[in-house]
Amino acid sequence: MIQSLRKILAVAVLAVPFAANATIFQFTASLNGVNENPGSANQGFGSASLKYFDQGTASLADDRFAFVLSAISLGGVATAYHIHGAASFAENAPVRIALDAAPFVTLTNAGGTLVVIGNNVVAPVLIAATPVTGVNAGHPAMSFLQMLQSGLAYVNVHTTAQPGGAIRGQLIQVAAIVPEPEAYGMMLVGLALMGVVVRRRKQT
């Protein structure tokens, strides 16, 4: 069942309408307790994938992103999960995007397993300059895409036992893609699958 869900999510995460001149930037994160600052004793681990759709327009407000987070062996229910920034591996930073609230959908959060998806999410235009704790004194204001491309965004999952953070992973860029025309058909398939997943969740 988990494998089937992952296959559905792999396609559904692409279900974001984009312009012909759009560029897709892909970021991934590996989450574990060692990455927490300070470290966490939580034995869980997970992965996250974020696809940022740069629409190629003058306004960053037109940009969208899709997101998938999955984690297992958390030792209990996740109490909160967010994207934080701007911060390097050795730093902590404020919450920038709440993954446990709309428009994100939590498909599973039980028995130490967490699965979250977000589709066609409006990308934040500006990440305000905020002092962070850690090695550096702080980072200047920047766009969400700049924060991602600088490796200064991280995913953090919290539990009752580790309210400050159970597992964490830095989002790292792995690809930049200009979609070919045939990719638009894949977008339609992704949209259909996303609808199926959400409907099944509502029925359970």
Give the location of each predicted region.
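Bacterial N-terminal signal peptides that target proteins for export
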Residues: 1-9
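Metal-centered catalytic cores of metalloenzymes
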Residues: 2, 21-81, 85-177
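A short, hydrophobic C-terminal helix/tail in secreted or cell-surface proteins
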Residues: 179-199
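Short, charged juxtamembrane terminal tails flanking transmembrane helices
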Residues: 201-204
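N-terminal signal peptide c-region/cleavage motif recognized by signal peptidases
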Residues: 17-19
